[in-house]
């Protein structure tokens, strides 16, 4: 079954690569670790390289103790149907070509392009159904209460022993979770002549999660054209992609506002059907209020359905990628190439906690909480390389790459988040309703640039013995300050292999 996140398709197929799929569901960030974790407090994730150009896989911040915000990532936006092949690059070769970002290894992705011949139209559809496979085990022998008594707690299940007359038969898997569905449709077109090839694809991913009111939608549009000039000595390759994504209530594990916590711990002696109607009309306030007779007690719990339908978190993202590469073959064994790639995205994240949500989560407000943040990511990469691939006699081969690159990354985040003021209107979500004394208005971001020179030389003998030399020097902007004692760092390597 094809996965909507192309990274997950590598699971179990590459030796030494561990892939942990996201607990947030479709669109969530997956962790890829090659040959073990490299550090305690730093990411061990691999670098992704698409058609020879690094893609710096920025991901959103996950949820915190009182903030359930699932995290997505840039690589999860890519349409798996546009992928021609994937390979894994580790060691000094990865670091020499792509810098310190590839210290944990690199996943090299080659995308599809048009093929010479008749017009080809491909239509594919994939539907996946999701149900829990491994779930926690809970006792169902004792009812609501504590210490074998019906008193002491309204949220625990250590009360009197249940029997056939008072056991409600509650099961969180069948009673709360639903069958998830992931539907993927793709249409692709390929056509070309000997001198010009064109590829176009459009794809839609629509997912309904297992947790109620958790949805994910993504739409991809990709265009690529490859043209040869000057008796096939020069090749121009251009591509453009646009991605529109929306996710709602992406679940984050281990937080108090995760609906699974109270769904799992719901007292076995209580009636689940009673709390399915998660809100009641309050005539004194003229609003619907949360119904959760179990209370908050020790783990800041809420009605799971209230969390799903009245603690709303929505993320909307627009992303476009433009790239171009030009290759000129000077001699049969010598060529020069240049590449440039622009990858920009704009995201808007909104958070709406309705009135009577737990006041620990709404920062003390009985009228609700509202948050909105906008994030703009801009990535630009360019490189120029001299490529050598030459045979010397019958026994010796030489492969070398010598070049320079520039990587520029920017991020700007604007955020407004705070409780609705006590004299405000409940459940009216805009920044004018927020309590000025408690609202957090922040602006953050960064602008990093790295300029590099690199070289990789591999000498082969009889297609059996190989000697590899690599070297790279980076000039990162982080070392450009007046107090820096070093403006660049060099990392060379020497390696050998026998096949």
Residue ranges and their predicted role:
Residues 1-223, 228-229, 234-238, 321, ...:
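Short, small/polar-rich motifs associated with maturation and membrane association
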Residues 30-32, 105, 400, 488, ...:
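Extracytoplasmic/periplasmic beta-strand context in beta-sandwich domains
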Residues 83, 221-223, 338, 382, ...:
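Extended, hydrophobic alpha-helical segments in both membrane/secreted and soluble proteins
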Residues 195-198, 232-236, 333-336, 396, ...:
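Repeated loop/turn-to-beta-strand initiation elements of outer-membrane beta-barrel proteins
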Residues 65-66, 322-328, 342-344:
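Alpha-helical support elements that line or immediately flank enzyme active sites
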